[in-house]
Amino acid sequence: MEQLIKTTTAYKIFCGDIRSGKVSHAYMLRFEDAKNMRAVLKLFALEFFKTGEGQPLGHRILSESYPDFRLYPQEGKKFNADAAAEIVEDSAMRPVEGSKKLFAISGFEQASALVQNKLLKTLEEPPEGVHFILGACSLAPVLDTVKSRVKILEIPPFSCGQILAALERNGKSPLNSAAAESANGILGVAENMVAGGWFQQLKDAAAEICAVSDAGEIGAIAVKHGDIKYKEELLAEMQRLYFTALTDGGGAAGKLSKPALVYALEKLNEAAAQLKLNAYFQALLYEFMLDVVNFSHRTEE
């Protein structure tokens, strides 16, 4: 992860601010990787305090034991009103060891409007030497009044090649390539795929859905996979299979004609959009398979 982050424009801008002495009082880091958000905020903190992971101060930052660096919320918790009040109170106190303090918040997009409002005044006019980095997977839930008080840095999804290289650095696995292609540019998603046995189940489900050619089988397949936990990842794996069939002519979807494969990819994009609107997944799968099968039969006639 460190190697990936240090190549990003967001990280380079932040480093430039630190080195030029023009550091903003508050940053908002948009980064879609919830799994790795805390680790990335710590990398930014190392740069803020001008230290490295191999140095004593760097070790304390990474272990969250340096009193002038506070990372919220606790692992697995949600940033709430009590934590916001604690930050407001703590920010008014002088740094314990150095000349500045850094507050980092992971998953800020999950904070309610009430909680975000509690920080507005402190974000706008923090005490001297106090700085903030707010990490959010999405900017949409963040209040405009908060966004107007911070400098926004964005880390876009990584390329498939970058994800694969990062996975290979973590360890060789026969799942690395497929995980990199199915993760939509999010390393944490790919890491979870490789680490969990569920990814093989997901691959099998995608293969079965993409291979269906009989309308009579669709209902049973939709019921079988309609409750799958990793819905977005399933659609991404299906997309990978269709694209592979379109370019190489093989795989689970290889029996479909090129027009049918293009149509399937278009319908997948529609399905992904409907999923974001909380569409019932079993029905979504059923309609998708039915549309593809019917289109395939029409083009064959």
Protein language model regions, located:
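Residues immediately C-terminal
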Residues: 78, 110, 125, 141, ...
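Charged, glycine-rich active-site and insertion segments that engage polyanionic ligands
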Residues: 1-62, 128-130, 137-301
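Conserved beta-strand scaffold positions in the cores of enzyme catalytic domains, especially
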Residues: 69-71, 152
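A short hydrophobic beta-strand->loop->alpha-helix junction that borders the nucleotide-binding pocket
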Residues: 30-32, 71-76
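Loop/turn-to-beta-strand initiation segments
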Residues: 98-102, 127-133
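Conserved alpha-helical scaffold flanking the Walker A/P-loop in AAA+ ATPase domains
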Residues: 12-18, 81-102, 109-110, 114-121
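A short beta-strand-to-loop transition that corresponds to the Sensor-1 phosphate-sensing loop
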Residues: 106-108, 134-139
